[in-house]
Amino acid sequence: RRGIDAAQGDYLVFLDSDDAWMPDCLQTLQTVIHNNAPDMVLYAGRVIREGSGGAQMIGHVFESEQWLTVSLMKEMLISGDELNSLWLKAFRRELFFGDDTDYSSLAGVHCGEDKVQLFYPLTQAANILYIPNCLYSYYYRADSTVHSFDVRDISRKLSQEMFSVLSLYMERWGMNDRRHQQLLALYQLRMYLSVYFGVRKSCATARERQILRKYPWGGIEKQWRPYYREIRCRLSVCERIKLLAAALRL
């Protein structure tokens, strides 16, 4: 937040300290902004893994340049993680003016805190331009705080602070109806499965497996269970099997 407050330019872009922009990143964005004057620009990046010769694309959601509606972007944030990152977006700086979001619950949080920063500027945006250009290099480290799983970090990985702020913004956006609650429930269910099986895979001892099973998963399940009959059809066969295994704490 201090960086945003100190910024002087017309547009803001973000860079994690251990990542890199592609050589043509800023020039490409300057040209796109000059030609289109968008409130936000979304672009793609590549994920570089240690010991791997290839690179996986991230943020590549469409094949061609196109304008997105703000409502579509909001629905994509309610539905999953695909567009979470600040660092695959450029923002008109004015979008951050007057941000009244309470970020106090996110102090020291390293899961979901990036996504929360998107909600206020998106509320202020009138238009969004997507370009398929790969402009960012994200260096994936399996032992990083974000990607590693540990039985002592279950609560952190479930991103409950992020979901709480997202729920407040859904109400603010007028997206608190049952259809949008179903999208959120499906997102929460998939987060639950990801964390449960990610942590289970990391358990090396009987004691760790016991901690996993004793965790109060029931409170997490209550978030999506009221919508399960409606969202069940959107789950893959694999997800349904995993859900049964998690429910039995296997």
Question: What residue spans do the PLM features occupy?
Answer:
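Catalytic metal- and UDP-sugar-binding loop of GT-A-like glycosyltransferases, i.e.
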Residues: 15-17
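Membrane-interface aromatic/basic loop that binds lipid-linked glycans or pyrophosphate carriers
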Residues: 197-250
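Amphipathic alpha-helical repeat scaffolds of TPR domains
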Residues: 185-194
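Glycine-rich, basic loop-to-helix element that forms the pyrophosphate-binding segment
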Residues: 1-7
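Short aromatic/hydrophobic "clamp" motif used to bind/position activated sugar donors
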Residues: 12
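Short, charged, amphipathic alpha-helical segments
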Residues: 179-186, 209, 213
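Donor-binding/catalytic cores of nucleotide-activated saccharide
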Residues: 20-129, 136-153
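C-terminal, non-catalytic tails of nucleotide-sugar-dependent glycosyltransferases
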Residues: 159-183
